[in-house]
């Protein structure tokens, strides 16, 4: 009930459950990841944040803000993070660009990890990955495809993507 112009009115309105952009703690679920040109990407989640000791103080401030305040929308279902760079001749110069969120790939804003992987898989020529702090990462798609097995073998990684992204192929 509310008071409007001297009279009491009853109001009804639906309350929707908040759809967080970054999932809270998840159990019995393997992490989602995608490796492209030695760059390891994964969605922002509480499980990912917990890889930092005292994560609420030590995780990147952008990650913490998005975890606390980010709300899902039709256009954005997940935050894609560049987790780390597996050193290789393909990605020389990009070693320090880990722990960043992805803004776009070839000027397309990815909705989620599946969409992100499909954009990269279908790209031709040079891929332009832009982070939220406007860092540009440029990779030649032919060189990425040629170097994929070398990188996975060097780091003893069985697959370039998690099982839930196995259907995303070029």
Say what each PLM segment does.
Residues 1-170:
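C-terminal recognition in membrane/secretory proteostasis and scaffolding
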